[in-house]
C-alpha cells in the first residue's frame, strides 16, 4: 500500500478545504484507509499499489506524510 494524492481519470487530485471531505473521497472513491487535506488537495493513506497518484516532489510527500491529522 502507498500514500499520495489519488487522481481521477483526468489526472487531477480532488481539491479541498475540509479534511472531512477528503476522508470521504479517499475512503469511498479511492478505497484508501483514510485521507485528509494537505496543501489544498486530498492526500490519501493506504491506497492500493495500482492506484494512480499525482507525481509530487519528495519534500511535499514528506510534508504530507508527516502532517497526519488523527
Curated annotation (Swiss-Prot):
Keywords: Disulfide bond, Ion channel impairing toxin, Neurotoxin, Secreted, Toxin, Voltage-gated sodium channel impairing toxin
Disulfide bonds: 16-37, 22-42, 26-44, 38-64
Name the UniProt record assigns to this protein: Toxin Isom2
One of the GO biological process terms: defense response
Keyword Secreted assigned: yes
Lineage: Eukaryota, Metazoa, Ecdysozoa, Arthropoda, Chelicerata
Purpose: Excitatory insect beta-toxins induce a spastic paralysis. They bind voltage-independently at site-4 of sodium channels (Nav) and shift the voltage of activation toward more negative potentials thereby affecting sodium channel activation and promoting spontaneous and repetitive firing.
Domain notes: Has the structural arrangement of an alpha-helix connected to antiparallel beta-sheets by disulfide bonds (CS-alpha/beta).
InterPro entries per the UniProt record, alphabetical: LCN-type_CS_alpha_beta_dom (IPR044062), Scorpion_toxin-like (IPR003614), Scorpion_toxin-like_sf (IPR036574), Scorpion_toxinL/defensin (IPR002061)
Amino acid at each position: 500500500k502507498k500514500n499520495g494524492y489519488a487522481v481521477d481519470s483526468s489526472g487531477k487530485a480532488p481539491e479541498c478545504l475540509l479534511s472531512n471531505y477528503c476522508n470521504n473521497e479517499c475512503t469511498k472513491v479511492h478505497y484508501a484507509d483514510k485521507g485528509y487535506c494537505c496543501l489544498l488537495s486530498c492526500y490519501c493513506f493506504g491506497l492500493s499499489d495500482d492506484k494512480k497518484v499525482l507525481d509530487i516532489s519528495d519534500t511535499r510527500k514528506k510534508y504530507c506524510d508527516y502532517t497526519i491529522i488523527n
